[in-house]
Amino acid sequence: MIVSKSIKAAAHNLSKACNALNFSEPVTHVYNPLEYAWAAHEQYISRAANGKKKVVFLGMNPGPFGMAQTGVPFGEVSAVRDWIGINAPISKPENEHPKRPIEGLTYARSEVSGRRLWGLFAERFDSADAFFTDHFIVNHCPLVFMEETGKNRTPDKLPNDEAAPLMEICDTHLRKVIEILEPEWLIAIGEFAEKRALAASGEIDVRIGKILHPSPASPAANRGWAEQASAQLKKLGVWH
């Protein structure tokens, strides 16, 4: 319980610090699911971060069809609702984009990355609780950035004067999560996450690895992502 309480406090501090930042065009809308979906995120932490971990998986930031809707990293609706068991009410962001409405756990569109990631874990582990015994998933950045058209803009596309303070805040949070959970492994999901893992870890005693990002925008990920990710984790010695 002390561990989950500490992770919740770290997430709250991250959210508050990110809310103090400003972003300019082409970004017109910024969602912070740690605010409007806090009840679901808090439920996720209570379920997933109830003790020390062997492995922490690191994502980049929420997807508009995943965590933006559910408050859970890579939060494909059916996985969050049916496998993890999240049922908390989810409200709406203050400045909602008309093309990116937040519908929470009733959202009909499936997030492919989340379906692939949580699907792999559901195949390997008997239950979400079994997975969370040694594993936790966290995003580096909690914010979702959108352009006027509704197009998603990832943090790596932000200008440096906006990205630098954001990265500093998010790196600090990541270090805090690692200090609290004391994992043996920090596994980056994709290249951006790997860069942030390396930048943030510094003097912290944690081994860093990387797996292929499950995004459908990646041709490699569309050729049997689960098999490739499992093989990468086994090669690292994370899984056996």
Question: Where do the language-model regions lie?
Answer:
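Active-site metal-binding loops of divalent metal-dependent hydrolases
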Residues: 191, 214
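Short hydrophobic/aromatic-enriched beta-strand-loop microsegments
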Residues: 204-213
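Short, aromatic/basic amphipathic alpha-helical patches
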Residues: 197-203
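A polyanion-binding, active-site-adjacent surface
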Residues: 2-185, 194-195, 219, 228-240
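Loop-rich non-cytosolic ectodomains and luminal regions
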Residues: 224-225
